[in-house]
């Protein structure tokens, strides 16, 4: 596993080791031991995943920007197993020097990249291919009462979703999230969300 730090602490791009031959390829999509050895020292704490999710979406679908409020916060490790998505993490930790900034990475079935999103970030993605199958690991179970989000269409975030606005397909719930300027974040950079 090769880990790539981004411009925002707590967000990492992970490149798995692929073994290719005439039959195709093989890789470990997740190894708790390797994650603990290589990622934990960067984060400064362990992450223990407990739930795997998978979604299938068509071109233009935009999901996000989601998070779970304390005490049910989630870290995520995400990847695209079929198709292409633009995946984004937005720092929403009050007091963070990168508050409101984002990291975007294209995840595809060909590059096999994974994206680690720290607690205290809003997460979302847009489907760039005809269809996409998206998988993500979470370190806390889903709690609908703690569900939260900021608008995926907030222009002030400066995210180029690579989808024309007239092709964007959002759930009704995602159209109702607040813009960042109207959002009171439940996260603070000085509060350890992993205790």
Model-derived regions: residue spans:
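Conserved metal-binding segment of the jelly-roll/cupin
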Residues: 107-131
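Non-catalytic, conserved peripheral segments adjacent to functional cores
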Residues: 1-110, 131, 138-195
């Amino acid at each position: 596993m090769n880990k790539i730090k981004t411009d925002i602490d707590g967000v990492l791009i992970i490149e798995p080791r692929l073994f290719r031959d005439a039959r195709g390829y093989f890789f470990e999509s997740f190894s708790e031991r390797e994650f603990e050895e290589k990622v934990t020292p960067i984060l400064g704490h362990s992450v223990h995943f407990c739930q795997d999710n998978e979604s299938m979406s068509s071109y233009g679908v935009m999901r996000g920007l989601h998070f779970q409020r304390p005490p049910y916060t989630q870290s995520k490790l995400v990847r695209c197993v079929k198709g292409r998505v633009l995946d984004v993490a937005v720092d929403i930790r009050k007091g963070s020097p990168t508050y409101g900034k984002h990291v975007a990475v294209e995840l595809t079935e060909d590059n096999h990249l994974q994206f680690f999103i720290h607690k205290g970030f809003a997460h979302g993605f847009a489907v760039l291919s005809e269809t996409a199958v998206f998988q993500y690991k979470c370190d806390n179970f889903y709690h609908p009462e703690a569900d939260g989000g900021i608008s995926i269409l907030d222009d002030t975030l400066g995210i180029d979703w690579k989808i024309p606005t007239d092709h964007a397909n959002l759930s009704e719930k995602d159209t109702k999230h607040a813009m960042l300027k109207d959002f009171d974040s439940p996260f603070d950079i000085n509060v350890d969300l992993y205790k």
